[in-house]
């Protein structure tokens, strides 16, 4: 459950380390983002010589949340941290590697490139 001002770790190799959510995309009244939702964020922490710089405004897709997500079969999935992957205008990941597990819900939202790069899909 990500909202404005939430901080997320970055799960790719773009050079960003931490993001601050500015806006949840998907309608004027959409308040929270879950797994597979797109957010607009700013880079709060970045490594030197990375693809993105500190202060840059980026789009990202949420891949892990601490708040549990209910699945159609009645089970729940939750992670130890909130994490996102930076994406471009065509919803493809900007990085070439994904770190850590990602949720299966990304497959239903058609983020196939992220699914294929991820080391584990839960």
Swiss-Prot record:
InterPro entries: Ribosomal_uL14, Ribosomal_uL14_bac-type, Ribosomal_uL14_CS, Ribosomal_uL14_sf. SUPFAM superfamilies: Ribosomal protein L14. GO terms for cellular component: cytosolic large ribosomal subunit. GO terms for molecular function: large ribosomal subunit rRNA binding; structural constituent of ribosome. GO terms for biological process: translation. Keywords: Ribonucleoprotein, Ribosomal protein, RNA-binding, rRNA-binding. The keyword Transport does not apply. Part of the 50S ribosomal subunit. Forms a cluster with proteins L3 and L19. In the 70S ribosome, L14 and L19 interact and together make contacts with the 16S rRNA in bridges B5 and B8. Belongs to the universal ribosomal protein uL14 family. Binds to 23S rRNA. Forms part of two intersubunit bridges in the 70S ribosome. This is Large ribosomal subunit protein uL14. The lineage of its organism: Bacteria, Bacillati, Bacillota, Clostridia, Halanaerobiales.
């Amino acid at each position: 459950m990500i909202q404005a001002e939430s901080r997320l770790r970055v799960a790719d190799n773009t050079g960003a380390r931490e993001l601050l959510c500015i806006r949840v995309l998907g309608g004027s009244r959409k308040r929270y983002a879950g797994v597979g939702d797109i957010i607009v964020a700013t880079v709060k922490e970045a490594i030197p010589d990375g693809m993105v710089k500190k202060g840059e405004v980026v789009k990202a897709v949420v891949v892990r949340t601490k708040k549990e997500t209910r699945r159609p079969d009645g089970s729940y999935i939750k992670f130890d941290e909130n994490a996102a992957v930076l994406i471009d205008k065509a919803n493809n990941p900007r990085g070439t590697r994904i770190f850590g597990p990602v949720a299966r819900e990304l497959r239903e939202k058609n983020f196939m490139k992220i699914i294929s790069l991820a080391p584990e899909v839960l």
